[in-house]
């Protein structure tokens, strides 16, 4: 299979990023309900093959191991043959990124769509790299109250440790939320970036979706409010922790159920200066 020039065929490329358990799958399901949008299950393409640390990228070798990783990931989501679009080997991280984007382009074209939406929360760490290759890429940052994310991440990592690098400690969950919040805050007011607050989305879904669609360049569709069928399509069978996305919208919190009063007080103390108010734009 030979790579093809797809820039004219693809109208828009969108990444949904944030911290796990923030509502990224919900946002994906809603936006992917539009008839022009293609959205696969989480690809993990970038986070599984490209170093998170910037200083490691210039000397990174992309070869047999990385190609095999992408092959496995493609097989899980049903696009095995597209691994042929990868370079045989390269030291050029930008070239590797181009090939990964081209693979998603080809998925989108195959499904007769012209807008694609990829949702792997930790692709948050690759925003600048992706933008350097495709400057018009749009990023949707999903944010949720720290107490709720920390409780959910702490809980789900104990129920499904094999998918979350083992059970996460309270301090680790706090660290991840705060770190990712700092990264997202760097892009406030930037072109092609929109920040979606989970609590607002649940309370005022149409308003928030319209705002998000405007940044993407997508017409709002009422289909986005009937998203539960799409929620099943964008998740793999083993991702049982995402089942809540096929239920009606609801504000829910595990904070008081998961943590003791002492733990709750500790978490609230650590988060006392962290507010999502800066994202209210």
Residue map of PLM features:
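P-loop (Walker A) phosphate-binding loop of NTP-binding proteins
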Residues: 19
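A conserved segment at the C-terminal end of the G1
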Residues: 25-36
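ATP-binding Walker
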Residues: 22
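PAPS-dependent sulfation machinery
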Residues: 38-118, 123-124, 248-249, 253, ...
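Phosphate-binding beta-loop-alpha motif at adenosine-nucleotide cofactor sites
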Residues: 114-121, 189-216
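Conserved phosphate-donor/acceptor-positioning beta-strand/loop module used by diverse small-molecule
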Residues: 119-120, 130-155
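PAPS-dependent sulfotransferases, especially Golgi type II membrane carbohydrate sulfotransferases
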Residues: 1-15, 52, 91-94, 154-157, ...
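A structural motif corresponding to the C-terminal end of an alpha-helix
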Residues: 107-110, 183-193
